[in-house]
From Swiss-Prot:
Stated family: Belongs to the TPT transporter family. TPT (TC 2.A.7.9) subfamily.
Provenance organism: Arabidopsis thaliana (Mouse-ear cress)
Protein name from the UniProt record: Nucleotide-sugar uncharacterized transporter 2
Domain of life: Eukaryota
Chief localisation class: membrane
PANTHER family, per database record: SOLUTE CARRIER FAMILY 35
Compartment(s) where it occurs, according to its Swiss-Prot or TrEMBL record: Membrane
Keyword check for tRNA processing: no
Lineage, opening ranks: Eukaryota, Viridiplantae, Streptophyta, Embryophyta, Tracheophyta
Length: 398
């Protein structure tokens, strides 16, 4: 060491000591950050704060959009080239893999803490798990028995159903300008995508029956996260077992026989596993988006994806959906832009009208007794997978 010190010199030794000190400080800072995040995950309120901090509306919806496009390609491979024509069983595999991954996270203490059981009734979690299974299963069955156009019409009907359901359940209303923007979006998507309306009686009944579970599913995911301090992963952990149970019950009724005769070789199994991993990410990203925004905004995101796929195919791959379809997609994107602008902070009509009202200062003299008691003033300050690329794509509803 003496020889090394003599070769390095005094200045070099000081430099190395300073570097060691900086590295130690960086290590301590990283350890403190890790410890802080770990402690935050130990309470539902802390976990909720971390989710809101790292997964705001833009991040969550972008994450959901990218994963949704990826699973379209994966499921097209599985259902088309691989020939796995069992959409309910594929959805069951997706949720089973998600459950296994969540159990792995829990074993490593990486799963966020759930709120106290008394804050959320067991019936709410059970209902959400059941609704998820029916929304996924009925969506796949509708796509199997109806044309893409009729399936898309049922999908568009989810938007007004959500608005009506939120009014009935929570007395939640939206402004007339938002209603008009949503109407433009729905009409534009209908013009862009509904090219045929072929269906049979059974398929039509399934499509109509799917609308309500799909709407309620989105509303419950959004409401439980925003009102009851649930995080996406914690809620997935609690509800996925119920979803798996109901999918097992639906599979004999909605899937064709012969799943055990399928060729489960390495190539086919790998493709199905990749689809399942993307299905987990789709469920997680969809839950994050619903927790960060609202059920209506999540539906608009799905319609945005539809328009982007249609216009992207026209611009990039030279497909020709027709002039009317292109105009419909552009109109829908315009409606989405207006709806997004109206949801920005301070852009609502009510907020703007309140800002225009003159403020009046009113002085009220309080009785002496009330003043002596310290009385003060208080102020009160509120897997769907798009079917356009292929009719054989399964849907994972979140």
């Amino acid at each position: 060491m003496g020889l090394v010190d003599s070769l390095l010199g005094k200045d070099a030794r000081k430099f190395l000591k300073r570097k060691d000190s900086d590295a130690a400080e960086a290590g301590r800072a990283l350890e403190e950050l890790r410890s802080s995040l770990y402690n935050e995950l130990k309470t539902s309120e802390g976990a909720k704060r971390q989710q809101q901090r790292f997964c705001g509306p833009v991040v969550a919806m972008s994450f959901n959009f990218v994963v949704a496009v990826g699973i379209i390609l994966a499921n097209k491979l599985v259902m088309g080239r691989v020939g796995f024509n069992f959409p309910i069983f594929l959805t069951l595999i997706h949720y089973t893999v998600a459950w296994i991954l969540l159990a792995f996270f829990k074993s490593l203490s990486l799963l966020p803490m759930s709120p106290p059981s008394k804050t959320t009734p067991f019936s709410s979690l059970f209902s959400l798990g059941a609704v998820m299974a029916f929304a996924s299963g009925l969506a796949n069955t509708s796509l199997k028995h109806n044309s893409v156009g009729f399936y898309q019409m049922a999908k568009i009907a989810v938007t007004p159903t959500i608005v009506l359901a939120e009014f009935v359940l929570f007395k939640k209303t939206i402004s007339s300008t938002k209603v008009m923007a949503l109407a433009v979006v729905s009409l534009g998507v209908a013009i862009a995508t509904v090219t045929d309306l072929e269906f049979n009686l059974f398929g039509a009944l399934v499509a109509v029956a799917w609308i309500i579970p799909s709407a309620i599913n989105k509303i419950l995911w959004s409401n439980l996260q925003q009102q009851a301090n649930w995080t996406a992963l914690a809620l997935m952990w609690k509800t996925t077992p119920f979803t798996v149970f109901f999918l097992l019950a639906l599979m004999p009724w909605l899937d064709p026989p012969g799943v055990l005769l399928f060729k489960w070789d390495l190539t086919n199994s790998s493709a199905i596993l990749i689809s399942a991993l993307l299905g987990f990410l789709l469920q997680w990203s969809g839950a994050l988006a619903l927790g960060a925004t609202s059920a209506t905004s999540h539906v608009v995101l799905g319609q945005f994806k539809t328009c982007v796929i249609l216009l992207g195919g026209y611009v990039i791959f030279g497909s020709d959906p027709g002039f009317i379809s292109i105009c419909g997609a552009i109109a829908a994107l315009g409606g989405m832009s207006v709806y997004t602008w109206l949801n920005l902070p301070g852009k609502s009509i009510d907020h703007m009208s309140n800002k225009q009202l003159p403020k009046q200062n009113v002085t009220v003299s309080k009785p002496k007794a009330e003043a002596d008691d310290g009385g003060g003033e208080t102020g009160v300050t509120v897997v769907s997978v798009d079917p356009l690329l292929s009719k054989t794509i399964t849907a994972n509803i979140v």
